């Protein structure tokens, strides 16, 4: 046939099917993505290293000889409109059909047709065809843009040749004459069915042989994205290139990616802060609720991308699109149910179902039949995940961390991470560089985080595989390296507070609820590695436990399942934060006893010489305090699960914790700490407005932690208090000393936490340099203090600290000669100085020789090609490519790797061999550097005790500095308290103010004089109107005493005190629903503790005792308690009340002083003006009606209330004046009869009982 006839025949054919052509063309071209022109090096590093290859379609001509494992297609990046500015096609073109969704975008086809080949354009985006073709074919590249690379060739070769014919027609307008013509078989573009897809599984495969090298800087390649394989997300541009390059390279064995789900949209927006979701509330244990209280572990569910609108069946009765889609979904669901039946019927490792009393939500049962079907990566994943079902597992794959199944659902629902439905498993992912950020976000929500890392690099695996003699599964080695919880964080970047974060184990021994329990306690601050242990017998109200928990405020608790009483659980709930994590672990097997602890210590080699090398406190507790050792055993087991047991125990940092320290410190129980708002306020539980917030002005984080301990235990000895006051006064009066201390303190990092990371061998090189620089600064400061201020500081605590601090000058100088500090700080690598380490020097020399050989080879090529402009170019992981001008001919055995308009880049066999030798040498050098890091840390840790002592001394100086700064911030007047050592208690404050009143209110605050003890009465009975300032006065006296005994100035014109042994408070009115205790019962319980424990040198504050019951009972109880305090105990204190008759009862008692808070009252308008002044006398009324008027109650209601009040006052006058009648009418005597086991009340013994209160 002639050429003309062929043309006519083709024209006729095209005339008959133009519409068919348009639909067919669009069906293909709408799947081809636009070429991205991003040139960001950091994006290149992240995206190119997480790519995986795909199989060449069966329809492609095999003569292309393209190695199906050689390409490394780029990931498609999120684009902005600006990316297409130069590639858009005229929207008015008749060839551009309206956008529509892909009717074959369902994921079901992969599970139904696993044997079919994969279509070449699977998972391509739905970009405009015009954009694609203009960018990929017609657009002229810039001078330095990539125009040729094997990857790009692979992308085009994977398409049928008819694509280019269709493309050519698309680029050139078609006449209207041809619009309705039908395409011939030759012209029809290749459009593979969605069913043509290779077998896939739920996760990415590790089975491939093409390793990638470490990424390097270079311009961004412009490539067509041919598949959306193992990279399910793209690292955003803001992730630095340095951090990306420092990461492990992607698995060589992952790049085949059998688990690819090409139809899914895998891109993820990450690393930007996620807006808070209002629908999810923060809870004490979000993870537990997610797995235990929420739905069971979700079965995988398919997702269908796009919206396929149903179409009618054709004339031949073929199923329409909707029916096919329904069939595919049913088959997909059936396959998942068959393969993952154990995810639908959830059981724990012991095969207990959800709801069973013994069900353990931490584990999952996987039947043996399921293991037989798993691929190597699946086995690796489930082997770890099955024991961490209550934990969100971050699984490293190359430069990304991925979350699967329920973990992925949490990431998607709570943090809006992009969710991808695999065939059997949902997945979300984050870049490796942003792990710390996302881990912190999950932990802040109450989740437990597990980190599974690659334990070898891709090149390292290749070297290891060559050394193997037997065939093994091709999967990169991974292992559980960390489990992170809010109570056991160790990384400085994740810790949100400078204060200690504790994880506490509690062991209880109790025979019955009515007996006094015994407790063993062990808690640890994992950021510093400090263990604290104690054992004690408590009262039935758990007073000591309450005090300890209030002081420590643990973030995480470990309790023995079914072995701790409900009373103790209620006491713990009352003291700890609602966000605290509760862990109930199994007795014996997990909550270890003495014998098991001893065996584990010996077997685990935690201390030098085994048990003999253990700290003294631990050895003594092993033989004497079994409850405390059992608590340590539980904590020991828990730390082992978190991979922290070796790091923490081997430090040997153990001490005994005494919550009361009765012999040396001022005792404040938990109730007092809460009532006085020492560490947490009553508003939101935060530190704003607390005494700690006011006084703690420490500069260093470790100084703040020590100051917290000081405030928990103010001093009791007058000598010790005066010694502290001397140092505070010295610093406050000497600006040069103050400036010197500030000068070296404010530049210090958190050395206490950092050296614990060095001990664990997990410190970064840059952090290690910070440690050394910090100790250099401290050592220099102590040298300066010794030289310049020893004379003025001699004889004070400051002088003792300066003299006692170890001098580490020689050791620090040795470290300056050990390695390059600048390189370690900036590049994160240890480079020993020449001659310091022979192995390192040899390896470094070998690398230099190999590089010299490469450059010698380059010089040889320059001569061979007679071109002096040849040079090496690194493109991604393809390093040392020979870059040659495009007009220079090269030998036929040179393989072109990439190129630009002006240059081409090549490899040859000789060059490849030398590059491989260099890369292997670099890999071995990294191993040597890793060993060097370990050697450095072991050497530093050999002086751990000296470093720690230097930190403690520095922290003490910081605390003294804080007290001097706090005193100056109090405002005038403030003074140094006078400490008087005498037998009887005494308090004197002139013009005392509340220290926590802010500066704006300080000028209007009314100061008061307070005198207790000595020549004055021990107890002040205080009356006054509501809102007159009674409670504020009571609190400010207690806080002034605490400040004085802490060693701080007090907000008064003059102060003189005898050191108190304890402070007890009973303030406010609250019930305890959890313990089934009414307001009155809570009042009496707290009062009972005070009566049991207070002594002559105790300061007692009782606010409106008796208001929780009837007037008569309340008055009787208040009378009896007050009488016992002033007549039998003799303590100092305040007793505020609204019972004016109580003042009459004690009007002539020599140890009671009657005082009131003054107020001016206008009866006509019912207005009360509070004067806030403490003066002698009894307030005649509480002026409740006046306060009611101020609150806005209706006048009619207030008038009626006044009339009723007058009637009640008259009716009760005779009752109040008759003590015998009070005793007879009150239930209080019945309470006494029960508690004291006295005989039944009779007319004879009632007067005797009443006499006991006089």
UniProtKB/Swiss-Prot annotation:
According to the UniProt entry, which residue ranges have a biased composition of type Low complexity? 62-72, 102-114, 295-313
Question: Which terms in the GO cellular component ontology are assigned?
Answer: cytosol; MutSalpha complex; nucleus
Entry's Gene Ontology BP terms: maintenance of DNA repeat elements; mismatch repair
The answer to whether the entry has keyword Cytoplasm is no
Leader sequence segment: none
Disordered: region residues: 1-324
**Keyword field:** ATP-binding, DNA damage, DNA repair, DNA-binding, Nucleotide-binding, Nucleus, Phosphoprotein
Comp. bias intervals (Polar residues):
79-90
Q: Modified residue Phosphoserine is at which positions?
A: 205, 299, 307, 309
| Nucleotide-binding listed as a keyword | yes
Q: Where is the composition biased (Basic and acidic residues)?
A: 8-18
Among Gene3D superfamilies, the record links this protein to: 1.10.1420.10, DNA repair protein MutS, domain I, MutS, connector domain, P-loop containing nucleotide triphosphate hydrolases
Q: List the disulfide bonds.
A: none
One Gene Ontology MF term: ATP hydrolysis activity
Q: What InterPro entries does its record include?
A: DNA_mismatch_repair_MutS-lik_N (IPR007695), DNA_mismatch_repair_MutS/MSH (IPR017261), DNA_mismatch_repair_MutS_C (IPR000432), DNA_mismatch_repair_MutS_clamp (IPR007861), DNA_mismatch_repair_MutS_core (IPR007696), DNA_mismatch_repair_MutS_N (IPR016151), DNA_mismatch_repair_MutS_sf (IPR036187), DNA_mmatch_repair_MutS_con_dom (IPR007860)
- The residues the record assigns to binding ATP are 1024-1031
| Stretches with biased composition (Acidic residues) | 204-213, 251-262
The record's subunit annotation is: Heterodimer of msh2 and msh6.
Q: Which family does it belong to?
A: Belongs to the DNA mismatch repair MutS family.
Function per UniProt: Involved in post-replicative DNA-mismatch repair. Has a role towards base-base mispairs and insertion-deletion loops.
- Identify this protein by name: DNA mismatch repair protein msh6
Source species taxonomy: Eukaryota, Fungi, Dikarya, Ascomycota, Taphrinomycotina
